[in-house]
């Protein structure tokens, strides 16, 4: 019987998972190794909806070691995630330091950006599609445009 780890999402939902699944996250792995995971690990930046997706991914990657099987499963798994929360999954993968999931979500976003789905859309339309808040001021946008003028020609 494997050791269990309790994770608590930002919206208060608890998830009890196997330690080997939790250790797919380098951040959680460090907490376990440092003895900080004695009770519940609070994940203040990850909602229960997103955490469930991350846990599903980690469980599959712990249980299956066949590279080809995982590639096919990963592709199918990404198709089940709504594009409006894909960015949140990416941010959770980054926060939890799960490099393989971060790489997968980045590739999926890149593929979507190159596909007809987002072709010809403005930055504001793309942000709306992925439910990304624009937290830059007009001055910051102007500075970025000035520093990267070559990209806007």
Swiss-Prot record:
Gene3D superfamilies: Potassium Channel Kv1.1, Chain A
InterPro entries, alphabetized: SKP1, SKP1-like, SKP1-like_dim_sf, SKP1/BTB/POZ_sf, Skp1_comp_dimer, Skp1_comp_POZ
Tissues of expression: Restricted to inflorescences, especially in the inflorescence meristem (IM).
Species for this entry: Arabidopsis thaliana (Mouse-ear cress)
Protein name: SKP1-like protein 5
Keyword Zinc-finger: no
Location of region: Interaction with the F-box domain of F-box proteins: 90-153
PANTHER family per record: SKP1
Function, in words: Involved in ubiquitination and subsequent proteasomal degradation of target proteins. Together with CUL1, RBX1 and a F-box protein, it forms a SCF E3 ubiquitin ligase complex. The functional specificity of this complex depends on the type of F-box protein. In the SCF complex, it serves as an adapter that links the F-box protein to CUL1.
GO biological process assignments: auxin-activated signaling pathway; jasmonic acid mediated signaling pathway; protein ubiquitination; response to auxin; response to jasmonic acid; ubiquitin-dependent protein catabolic process
Entries under CDD domains matching the protein: BTB_POZ_SKP1
């Amino acid at each position: 019987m494997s050791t269990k780890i309790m994770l608590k999402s930002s919206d208060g939902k608890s998830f009890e998972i196997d330690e080997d699944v939790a250790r797919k996250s380098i951040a959680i792995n460090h907490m376990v190794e440092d003895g900080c995971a004695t009770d519940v690990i609070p994940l203040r930046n990850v909602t229960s909806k997103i955490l469930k997706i991350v846990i599903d991914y980690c469980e599959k990657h712990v249980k299956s070691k066949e590279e080809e099987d995982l590639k096919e499963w990963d592709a199918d798994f990404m198709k089940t995630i709504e594009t409006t929360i894909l960015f949140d999954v990416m941010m959770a993968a980054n926060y939890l330091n799960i490099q393989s999931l971060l790489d997968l979500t980045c590739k999926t976003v890149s593929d979507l950006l190159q596909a007809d789905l987002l072709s010809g859309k403005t930055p504001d339309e793309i942000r709306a599609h992925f439910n990304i808040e624009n937290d830059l001021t007009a001055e910051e946008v102007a500075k970025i445009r000035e520093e990267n003028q070559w990209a806007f020609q």
